[in-house]
């Protein structure tokens, strides 16, 4: 499945009855080069864990999974979980964690889910939560690099 193809995305979301939430500021990446270049810039590599925030339907997650040792993605919108289960089923190094990153002990999450690995963070964030998320990531003091797309 091409996670950056608007027709395929529309069909996928329709099958799952998904509706965008204005409150969550949801937007999905539809240009293939954006998740690819973001993943390249993130520092994801063999032997490196990746914390991703807000995977959406998974195009950035898939790119990170191709590069990193393990990807832990935190997703607030539970209606996206069955979609992610479908779109990321080929990646056994991806773990989706339902929850709010702003209510998560980020350092503990990284220690528990990616023990012994150096970790980078990567996200495509809605504008309205950019500052608190970046602040939380920096306060966690557990990342080799933080890559955020706004």
PLM features per residue range, with description:
Residues 1-150:
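Catalytic cores of RNA-modifying enzymes
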